[in-house]
């Protein structure tokens, strides 16, 4: 299983822009941009916690498990 970040989707649902998210969470704009462009980006739990707090969701709502491409090809 791989873990995919759902930050972009949750922020859109909440109507929060990348700029507002980076300022409110005190996370660099570069990191937010990377998370938005690469949902498999390996960020820290501290960053996820900050983003979750600003978005008003538990940190677990910002991630989801998806099958690895290797697992898909073996089935």
Where are these regions (language model features)?
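Short, basic-rich loop-to-helix N-cap that marks the start of a DNA-contacting helix
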Residues: 39-53
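A short, Lys/Arg-rich alpha-helix, primarily the initiator
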Residues: 1-15, 19
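Residues that mark the N-terminal boundary/hinge immediately upstream of a DNA-recognition element
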Residues: 6, 17, 44-47, 58
